[in-house]
Amino acid sequence: MEVRLADCAGFCFGVKRAVDTVYEQLKNGKTIYTYGPIVHNEEVVRELAEKGVRVLESKEELKNLKAGETIPTVIIRAHGVAKEIYDIMEANGLECIDATCPFVKKIHRIVEQKSTEGYHVIVVGDPKHPEVEGLSLIHISEPTRPY
């Protein structure tokens, strides 16, 4: 049997949707920001940067972005973010376009529901990974930590 590896496999549904969202917003001629890289693909992030998309890497950068004559557009990455990020955007009058993968959003809703029902939610994963950060900081009613 011969096993052949593809040079590239393409994007999953959620990543494709997030990237397509950024390209659609670029058509409007506005300055576009993403909170964190839109996806884990340096080639895509670099291509978007060449088209003018700016990546906000921290809460501090986001806090410094304010609505003025124009309202900045910030697109949430495919992996989701913590509730605090949405709150900062709202407080600063920013346009928020949520490109979080629907499957990730579903996990957020389940974790939030179970946490609210009194279940102890254990998140296993890299605490610095965007999906784990989003789950740990957005949807759990009591303080917890990823394992």
Model-derived features with residue positions:
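Short, charged/polar "capping" segments at the starts of alpha-helices
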Residues: V39-V44, A82-E84, H129-E133
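Single conserved hydrophobic/aromatic residue that forms the stacking wall/gate
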Residues: I138-Y147
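Phosphate-bearing ligand-interacting subdomains
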Residues: L62-K66, I71-I97, H108-R109
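Positively charged, low-complexity intrinsically disordered leader regions
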Residues: M1-K16, Y23
